[in-house]
Amino acid sequence: MWWSLIPLSCLLALTSAHDKPSSHPLSDDMINYINKQNTTWQAGRNFYNVDISYLKKLCGTVLGGPNLPERVGFSEDINLPESFDAREQWSNCPTIAQIRDQGSCGSCWAFGAVEAMSDRICIHTNGRVNVEVSAEDLLTCCGIQCGDGCNGGYPSGAWNFWTRKGLVSGGVYNSHIGCLPYTIPPCEHHVNGSRPPCTGEGDTPKCNKMCEAGYSTSYKEDKHYGYTSYSVSDSEKEIMAEIYKNGPVEGAFTVFSDFLTYKSGVYKHEAGDVMGGHAIRILGWGIENGVPYWLVANSWNVDWGDNGFFKILRGENHCGIESEIVAGIPRTQQYWGRF
């Protein structure tokens, strides 16, 4: 099934060379191989002593899943800049710069969604509402329309759930921020860290429609709703226009094992096997050394990649990065009475 969903650009990169290392994808051999290529990015060690089966489970997005209605294009009406970073454009919205950690769970589909929702609530209230939308609430309570929790899910289902049922607030693990903070602890899939070791993907926590002790607002009253949710066409300009006008979006792409070693530069697939589908948050774009890129936030903590972020080739639907864009607009009228 995966192969039918992998863009031609990735397949060509996968099959074009015969001298690629056949060793473990996290090995020094693989890292050295990538760094000896005349490519656009640098590899390094992000993971240490971690099973490949665990890493595959981190890629918990089902590509080619249910579709949301596609919004009407408007890029022709906008003069788009050569580069754009939502962190700078909306500096009064702290969630845009935040990197979360999905822990031992294939919940990337939920994280990409709630991160972008949090950003958009702040953006569309002109910085007046800063909230961390709860990944816990979405992961545990969305049910079958979103997929199978920690075993993988659909970004489109996440955004649809936001508009229909709403989501409460909730910060990262053990933060005691919001109604339902994340209950799956971060684990040490990186190098020389202090967190407990990753032992494999855990079960999806139970849906709990009650805020944690000490939070003053009820679960029902804490809900944040989307007004509308939609997909964005795979047009580079339309994706840029959507981010420029409304804020970061959720995207998904096919992950190959070389991506696990990304440290800096503009990622282009060079070597390795398919790991799975992975959802992320796209917050900007630019050009580095003549190579156009998307600026992306991952959910593997700040010690992965470039402080938790990465850049990936833009404009060629590389590894499907432009073909699974979803987003939505928050229901802002629910907030105006509070100001």
Swiss-Prot record:
GO terms for biological process: autophagy; cellular response to mechanical stimulus; cellular response to thyroid hormone stimulus; collagen catabolic process; decidualization; epithelial cell differentiation; neuron apoptotic process; protein catabolic process. One of its GO terms (molecular function) is cysteine-type peptidase activity. It is a peripheral membrane protein. Glycans are attached at residue 192. It catalyses: Hydrolysis of proteins with broad specificity for peptide bonds. Preferentially cleaves -Arg-Arg-|-Xaa bonds in small molecule substrates (thus differing from cathepsin L). In addition to being an endopeptidase, shows peptidyl-dipeptidase activity, liberating C-terminal dipeptides. PROSITE patterns: THIOL_PROTEASE_ASN (PS00640), THIOL_PROTEASE_CYS (PS00139), THIOL_PROTEASE_HIS (PS00639). Disulfide bonds join 93-122, 105-150, 141-207, 142-146, 179-211, 187-198. It is an enzyme of class 3 (hydrolase). Residues 18-79, 334-339 form a propeptide. The modification N6-acetyllysine is found at residue 220. Keywords: Acetylation, Cell membrane, Disulfide bond, Glycoprotein, Hydrolase, Lysosome, Membrane, Protease, Secreted, Signal, Thiol protease, Zymogen. SMART domains: Pept_C1. Thiol protease which is believed to participate in intracellular degradation and turnover of proteins. Cleaves matrix extracellular phosphoglycoprotein MEPE. Involved in the solubilization of cross-linked TG/thyroglobulin in the thyroid follicle lumen. Has also been implicated in tumor invasion and metastasis. Belongs to the peptidase C1 family. Dimer of a heavy chain and a light chain cross-linked by a disulfide bond. Interacts with SRPX2. Directly interacts with SHKBP1. This is Cathepsin B. It comes from Rattus norvegicus. The lineage of its organism: Eukaryota, Metazoa, Chordata, Craniata, Vertebrata.
